[in-house]
Design a protein with these regions (language model features):
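A structural signal for small-residue-enriched, beta-sheet-centric alpha/beta enzyme cores
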Residues: 1-91, 95, 101-409
Length: 409
């Protein structure tokens, strides 16, 4: 299937506008945008997936309640305070939805809140009461609207994350756009981040949720920065249906094409998140091939990108492939490592470092050149089957400790 990258992020699909403003949630950041608003022209099919952490943010509880009917029309997101472990958290999130509903003239039940920031801090409605009218007045269905919203949800991110692609369904051009944040507290099992997707494809709520839950295990659940599962991780998608394609109401060819498009944009966003890990200097992608089954392929690739020893080796540009084999070896499951081969690759070239679970002669000098690049691909061929999977992570640096040591200051 062919995809065309387009500008505009979440505003690229038909029927969506967005804005980002400063409302004062972060008292020590006088100018930083900290409130994002996303609005659809029509009531949309919608779906969400959330953190697996038992301690979850108040907005997630509200989202689950508001999405029971499978529809939404707006998303309100703040950065700087997680609204987690706060006595009034749910009531405050509901009040935010009321404010958005009033400003936009929509049902508050069709508003989905999200928060990111420091856990366990008091939170008041005043900044939202100021910021929501300002955001509503600033809504724009263009590149700037998406960019402002993407900026407003950032915390320790070093740059905004947005992407959009076009593809064809039922003879109609459809678009999917995304913004996301997250560079720390990122670990497999929907941990890490906030991500908001919009599409103008016509998809029923049931099939939209199924598509999202089909895509997440092989993308967002395959990403890790630090093995910390956040309390607020949220991925929400809204589908306006304004592209005019026949509505996807069954698992037909159009459904599978839609899932493929969602997978493509999710993989891109995962690489963006992992490559911008706190203090990171390298994006690490592990691609496992010829595994005995999908479960093993996913588990092995996750083990490699989660290995602190290997992450530290990449930071030091050290082709210590033994740490890769070690990570593969402690991966749960019943599989053979006897035929495992490993290559390290980047735009500077490729080195073959391990063959049949043993040393393969290579140049340390060439390996260091490969590992000097930002994007590193670890190719693991298990030689025992046909399954494959990817996982995304980053190196472990001194700055990761610095950033998290200073997080609340």
């Amino acid at each position: 299937m062919q995809y065309q990258e387009v500008a505009g992020g979440i505003c690229a699909p038909k029927g969506f506008a967005a804005a980002g403003v400063h409302c004062g949630i972060r008292a020590n950041h006088a100018e930083k945008y900290d409130l994002a608003l996303i609005k659809a022209d029509v009531r949309c099919a919608a779906a969400g997936v959330y953190t697996t952490n038992k301690v979850c943010g108040a907005p997630i509880k509200v989202d689950r309640a508001h999405l029971k009917d499978g529809y939404a029309q707006a998303i309100i997101v703040n950065s700087g305070n997680a609204n987690t472990c706060a006595a009034n958290g749910v009531a405050l999130a509901e009040e935010c939805c009321e404010l958005v509903g009033k400003e936009l003239g929509i049902d508050p039940q069709d508003v989905l809140p999200a928060s990111t920031g420091v856990i366990g801090q008091p939170m008041v409605i005043d900044p939202f009461a100021r910021g929501i009218p300002a955001a509503a007045a600033k809504l724009a269905a263009d590149e700037q609207g998406s960019a402002d919203a993407a900026t407003a949800i950032m915390t320790t991110d070093t740059h905004k994350k947005e992407y959009a692609i076009q593809f064809e369904l039922g003879g109609k051009v459809c678009t999917v756009g995304a913004i996301g944040k997250g560079s720390g507290m990122i670990a497999p099992n929907m941990a890490t981040m906030l991500a908001f997707y919009t599409t103008d494809a016509a998809v029923s709520p049931i099939l939209l949720e199924k598509a999202l839950k089909t895509v997440v295990p092989g993308t967002y659940n395959q990403m890790s920065v630090d093995l910390d599962t956040s309390t607020n991780d949220t991925l929400i998608i809204m589908a306006s249906g304004l592209a005019g394609n026949p509505e996807i109401c069954e698992e037909n060819a159009d459904y599978h094409a839609f899932v493929a498009a969602l997978t493509a944009i999710a993989e891109h966003m995962c690489a963006e998140h992992a490559g911008d890990g706190e203090g990171a200097t390298h994006l690490i992608t592990c691609e496992v091939t010829h595994a005995p089954d999908l479960k093993t392929a996913r588990a092995v690739s996750r083990s490699v990108v989660c290995s602190n020893l290997f992450k530290a080796a990449v930071f030091g540009r050290d082709a210590n492939w033994g740490r890769i084999l070690c990570a593969i070896g402690y991966t749960p499951g019943d599989f053979s490592i006897d035929k495992v081969c490993v290559r390290l690759s980047s735009k500077a070239g490729e080195v073959y470092v391990c063959e049949n679970a043993a040393y393969h002669p290579y140049s340390e000098e060439e390996a260091a050149k490969v590992l000097a690049e930002h994007d590193i691909l670890v190719k693991v061929d298990m030689g025992t089957g046909d399954a494959s999977a990817k996982a995304w992570g980053c190196d472990l640096t001194y700055d990761y400790v610095k950033i998290n040591g200073d997080y609340r200051t």
